[in-house]
């Protein structure tokens, strides 16, 4: 859908980052309104991965540390596998403030996928990427979702990626 139609708000509601003003949201037998903030945070950390429109990388950490900080197992082979798969090996020790946008985007994707989430929420994951990098990012997200049997919820106005998905809801 177009900018401003509520795509990000919908993702934030479904993931428990925002509380609905009416109605309720449930995931895996948990009703969000019955959970306290700590329980919602634990539900998110244990089940959800996020690729935010604004990447929210930690500027005083390097690329690898930004991925590791999200990992529930700091020595995980998954960190190394994602670094390799996403072509981040050459920049893993580079401070994120010195990365290009495409490199930063790939670090954010790796951070999202490091815990093999049950649900991947991707808010404009190809924003600012050229065709080649957009395809790499979408291919990786789809491959990881299939590998881990994750559900994938993508909000975008990028028409280039619409055909990658079997179910599309237009807003």
Language-model segments: residues:
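Conserved ABC ATPase "signature" region
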Residues: 31, 76-91
